[in-house]
Design a protein with these regions (language model features):
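C-terminal accessory regions
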Residues: 73-197
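Conserved helicase/translocase motor-coupling segment
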Residues: 1-71
Length: 197
């Protein structure tokens, strides 16, 4: 199984663009494949999909009759069946058949290409990473390392040597200023004042 890993979702080399193009090539429309549009995304039988957030209530079953609930952020599977009359989709995730309603299917996204961030915790036999110039806050050493280490057997870097060099040299992740530190200090001071009353 080959997985394309991108630094971001947006842009010409982001997952949104790649997924559209890869779906067209790898799973084009066919009269025998049912499809449905959810969140402006065409989901088609045979699509490679990923669960976008934890859902502890999605029912699943296994071939041996075992049943349970729960599918997790980052789980990848194949969309096997769309039943528009019943309003359900069946996705095979590893050895489980997961039953989605049209509403819960909004938690699915294409997984022909995923972000490096979203791929964390997964391994793939082969990884392809587009390596073209982009924003420095997305192109840093740890991102490259994370992407490469998702591959079990093979990594293919497609793009420019310069981009790879830039990523290797960029060992600083952009600092984010969320205000969380100041919020936590304020909360701690408030709690201390309440405690001392």
């Amino acid at each position: 199984d080959i997985q394309v890993l991108c630094p971001s979702r947006k842009g010409e080399l982001g997952t949104v663009s790649f997924n559209k193009k890869l779906q067209e090539k790898l799973n084009p429309p066919h009269e025998e494949k049912r499809e449905v549009v959810i969140n402006q995304i065409i989901l088609r039988e045979g699509d490679k999909v990923m669960q976008s957030k934890n859902n502890y209530n999605l029912p699943w079953s296994k071939e041996d009759g075992t049943c349970g609930e729960g599918v997790y952020n980052g789980d990848v599977g194949i969309l096997l069946e769309i039943d528009k009359r019943e309003g359900t989709l069946i996705v095979q995730v590893d050895d489980k058949l997961v039953l989605y309603t049209m509403e819960s299917a909004s938690e699915l996204e294409h997984a022909y290409a995923v972000t490096v961030h979203k791929s964390q915790g997964n391994e793939f036999p082969a990884v392809i990473m587009p390596m073209f110039p982009g924003p420095p806050q997305l192109y840093y050493r740890n991102l490259l390392y994370t992407g490469i280490t998702r591959a079990k057997d093979m990594v293919i870097l497609v793009g420019t040597e310069r981009t790879v060099y830039t990523m290797v040299e960029n060992d600083r992740k952009t600092r984010r200023y969320s205000g969380l530190y100041y919020f936590m200090i304020g909360e701690a001071e408030h709690e201390k004042a309440e405690f001392e009353k």
